[in-house]
């Protein structure tokens, strides 16, 4: 398939899997729409798993690199497993080593037949194409795609956390400190507030955590975070992490991080800082729409996660509407000891 795509002028043929979906994507010249339909219908209607064992080894090696041979990879896996008791977010996207080893072609075929069905598939096409022609070709090439209901999955609801959770690992590494808090899904009315808080605290060198922990106090070599971790379709985490500077401890990081969090509760964000954060957030969304591939990705994400691609543009209005009072309200409700998960990756002592 890769050779056909390349010869037809296609670029970026790839796929990825997250906590919520598997995506297949590439870009084609506009006049190759019918070839795209032919290739994709063949992928989903007549799959061949001839390289199963080769790909299985690739995945095992990827897990070794990302997790088994990575102290922070091991820590993050343990951290997520501690944060979630029942929700599937607790499982690593790549899977556990033994599960991968035990996987058979029959397992894959059974999964494919259950989940790769029209009712569970969303396609985004962006470019110089005629919508009527797209629908006509889709009917031609996907018309025989047998309709089946989505697999009936009753995802367990994560119970409310009632006390701080903590996990500690000792490995051969410079110490890391991780701290997370449960937050609602992307469809929640306060999603934009959480995004602003995440940016305010941990997005880049202008963030409060970087300025305080790295530049002012020299406690950390890096201080970052993420809102919507490990996914955001369902209730998830707002998550912060820092690599300690030589001679500093994870406990010092914890104190400094919580001081910044407490400021959000007690000190309203200034108009200047909030305007900057809103501008950055809006620019980030709009920047993703600058290319056809970026627009397809963004529209697809909102369609799948929120029920409508139009919610992407509604997010712009919600960002603009965030107030200092919103930030204080959400910070007070979210950043509590009962809602906290702590991860400490400590240096393993010799002997």
Language-model segments: residues:
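Short, polar/flexible loop-turn hinges at active-site or ligand-entry regions and domain interfaces
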Residues: 43-52, 66, 269-270
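Short beta-strands and strand-coil junctions in structured, solvent-facing domains, enriched
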Residues: 45-46, 131-132, 184-188, 247-250, ...
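Short amphipathic alpha-helices in soluble, non-transmembrane regions
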Residues: 37-42, 136-141, 253-259
């Amino acid at each position: 398939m890769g050779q056909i795509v390349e010869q037809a002028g296609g670029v970026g043929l790839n796929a990825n899997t997250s906590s919520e979906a598997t995506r297949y994507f590439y870009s084609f010249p506009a006049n190759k729409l019918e070839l795209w339909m032919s290739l994709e219908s063949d992928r989903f209607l007549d799959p061949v798993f001839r390289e199963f064992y080769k790909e299985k080894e690739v995945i095992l090696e990827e897990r070794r690199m990302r997790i088994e041979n990575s102290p922070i990879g091991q820590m993050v896996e343990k951290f997520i497993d501690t944060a979630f008791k029942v929700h599937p977010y607790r499982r690593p996207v790549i899977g556990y080593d033994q599960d991968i080893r035990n996987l058979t072609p029959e397992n894959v075929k059974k999964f494919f037949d259950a989940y790769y069905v029209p009712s569970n598939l969303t396609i985004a096409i962006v470019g110089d194409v005629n919508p009527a022609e797209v629908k006509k070709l889709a009917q031609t090439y996907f018309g025989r795609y047998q309709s089946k209901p989505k697999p009936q999955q009753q995802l367990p609801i994560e119970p409310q956390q009632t006390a701080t959770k903590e996990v500690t690992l000792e490995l051969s590494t410079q110490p890391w400190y991780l701290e997370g808090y449960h937050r609602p899904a992307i469809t929640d009315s306060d999603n934009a507030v959480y995004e602003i808080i995440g940016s305010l605290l941990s997005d880049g060198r202008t963030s409060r955590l970087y300025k305080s922990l790295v530049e002012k106090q020299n406690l950390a070599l890096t201080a970052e975070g993420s809102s919507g971790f490990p996914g955001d379709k369902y209730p998830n985490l707002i998550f912060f992490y820092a690599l300690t500077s030589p001679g500093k401890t994870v406990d010092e990081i914890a104190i400094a991080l919580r001081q910044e969090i407490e400021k959000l509760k007690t000190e309203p964000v200034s108009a200047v800082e909030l305007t900057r954060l809103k501008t950055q957030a809006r620019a980030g969304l709009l920047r993703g729409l600058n290319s056809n591939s970026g627009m397809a990705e963004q529209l697809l994400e909102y369609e799948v996660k929120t029920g409508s691609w139009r919610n992407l543009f509604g997010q712009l209005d919600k960002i603009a509407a965030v107030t200092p009072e919103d930030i204080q309200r959400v910070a007070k409700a979210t950043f509590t000891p009962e809602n906290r998960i702590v991860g400490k990756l400590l240096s393993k002592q010799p002997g």
